[in-house]
């Protein structure tokens, strides 16, 4: 990391401000070469914005603000310089080119954050939280990413690792001093502690909640043609996303939209009406609808309450059995023919909500239901699929160690415990291969 890196840190396109970031030993030299402070001189004070101009030879390139953050009090723990320029690609590209011609090289994706990790300012789980914070679409995801960035996952894993070290010390004592600690005594003392640690880690592994934070809740609207699925989708989204006509089978392909409820991201998919058809195009739409239902976290079965329950509706109700979802009685603004009492037996305990796509206030119970399905605990510890996978490997090794220990093979149990320790260290990056670092930081943008 002896070289100096530079990159544009803001998104491409026009905007109020564009930022060029430089990190490394030559950062301050580059600042001196291309920035002329107004009413001041170099060296600039650390961590304070200074007004001036980017200058090439005698030409003023841009009017800007510049700041130097001297090591170790910077994002990378190296000398870091940032130029706050007028937004727009041309200016930022020009200033970046000047930085590169002055001795810096173009940063790789995620290299600034990678240097923060390698220099010990953050661990690997916190580095991943930076990406999660950037990618967060909802308040719920933002809060989870911030908890991880401020060390929530790290402190939990390190506490678990400390307990594991203590258990390993007990195993080592039994091996080194067999005349003082028998294998039976070691098993009696350590096996319950291993089991408790395995349970603690298992409780922290909630794959569904982690996926909701990463990707949002997937909701599929299904039902027969002309029950108002597309109208309901449009009403929930507050826009005319799907084409609505009185002609059955208007929706032939999947229509998707994203809704934000109580800080959660909810992806809605309107599907083609589920029915038998000889139309080859419509049949493709029905097949896609069935695949969307299979992939959904929540299924909304939409029924038209202005007409009686049909055999096809009853068939759809049966397909909802064993699935997470609810029954939506639509068109409540029309004279009712079908009521929730008619569906109690067929509902299989699913919630039954009465709405009208044309009456916005009637949608609130449905929105509340969707928000509850998308909610995750504020106490969720592990939110990254990679972390959960590593914790699962640690749990498997702990269970193996417990079983081995109870058969009085203390030395073999020590091997299993070491495997568990390595899995936990992979989460924080204490033990990690270069290939994994490339994979993690390769997901970042260049300027981060």
Question: Which residues are covered by each model-predicted region?
Answer:
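A glycine-rich (often HGG/GG-containing) alpha/beta subdomain
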Residues: 1-143, 147, 151, 162, ...
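Short beta->alpha junction loops/turns
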Residues: 23-24, 88, 248, 305-306, ...
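Conserved beta-strand segments of alpha/beta enzyme cores
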Residues: 105, 265-267, 351
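Switch I (G2) and immediately adjacent beta-strands of P-loop GTPase domains
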Residues: 50-62, 66-70, 249-277, 295-298
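Short glycine-/small-residue-rich Rossmann-like dinucleotide-binding loops
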Residues: 237, 272-273, 297, 304-305, ...
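Inter-motif core of Ras-like GTPase G domains
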Residues: 282-306
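C-terminal-of-GTPase-core extension/linker across diverse P-loop GTPases
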Residues: 2-8, 12, 52, 139-260, ...
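Generic enzyme active-site microenvironment
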Residues: 268, 302, 328
């Amino acid at each position: 990391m002896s070289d100096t890196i530079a990159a544009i840190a803001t998104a491409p396109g026009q905007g109020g401000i564009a930022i060029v970031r430089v990190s490394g030993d030559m950062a301050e030299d580059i600042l001196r070469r291309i920035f002329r402070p107004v009413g001041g001189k170099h060296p600039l004070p650390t961590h304070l914005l200074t007004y001036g101009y980017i200058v090439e030879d005698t030409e003023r390139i841009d009017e800007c603000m510049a700041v130097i953050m001297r090591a170790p009090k910077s994002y990378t723990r190296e000398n870091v310089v940032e130029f706050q320029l007028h937004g727009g690609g041309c200016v930022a590209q020009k200033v970046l080119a000047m930085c590169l011609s002055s001795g810096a090289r173009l940063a790789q994706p995620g290299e600034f954050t990678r240097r923060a990790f390698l220099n010990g300012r953050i661990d690997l789980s916190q580095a991943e939280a930076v990406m999660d914070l950037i990618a967060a679409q909802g308040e719920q995801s933002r809060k989870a990413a911030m908890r991880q960035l401020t060390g929530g996952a790290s402190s939990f894993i390190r506490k678990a690792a400390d307990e594991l070290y203590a258990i390993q010390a007990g195993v080592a004592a039994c091996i080194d001093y067999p005349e003082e600690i028998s294998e039976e005594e070691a098993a009696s003392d350590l096996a319950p502690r291993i089991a408790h640690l395995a349970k603690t880690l298992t409780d922290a592994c909630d794959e569904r909640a982690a996926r909701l934070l990463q990707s949002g809740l997937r909701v599929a609207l299904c039902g027969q043609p002309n029950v108002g699925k597309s109208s309901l989708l449009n009403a929930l989204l507050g826009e005319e996303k799907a084409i609505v006509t009185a002609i059955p089978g208007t929706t032939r392909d999947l229509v998707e939209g994203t809704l934000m409820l109580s800080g959660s991201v909810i992806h809605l998919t309107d599907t083609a009406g589920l029915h038998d058809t000889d139309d080859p195009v419509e049949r493709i739409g029905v097949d896609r609808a069935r695949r969307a239902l299979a992939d959904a976290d929540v299924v909304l079965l939409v029924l038209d309450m202005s007409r009686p329950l049909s055999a096809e509706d009853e068939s759809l109700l049966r397909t909802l059995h064993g699935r997470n979802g609810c029954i939506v009685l639509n068109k409540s603004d029309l004279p009712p023919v079908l009521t929730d009492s008619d569906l109690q037996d067929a509902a299989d305990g699913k919630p039954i909500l009465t709405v009208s796509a044309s009456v916005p206030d009637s949608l609130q119970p449905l929105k509340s239901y969707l928000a509850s399905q998308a909610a995750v605990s504020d106490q969720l510890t592990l939110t990254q699929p990679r972390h959960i996978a590593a914790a699962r490997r640690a749990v498997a090794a702990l269970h193996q160690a417990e079983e081995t220990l109870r058969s009085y093979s203390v030395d073999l149990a020590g091997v299993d415990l070491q495997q568990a320790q390595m899995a936990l260290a992979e989460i924080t990056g204490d033990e990690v291969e270069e290939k994994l670092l490339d994979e993690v930081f390769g997901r970042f943008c260049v300027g981060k």
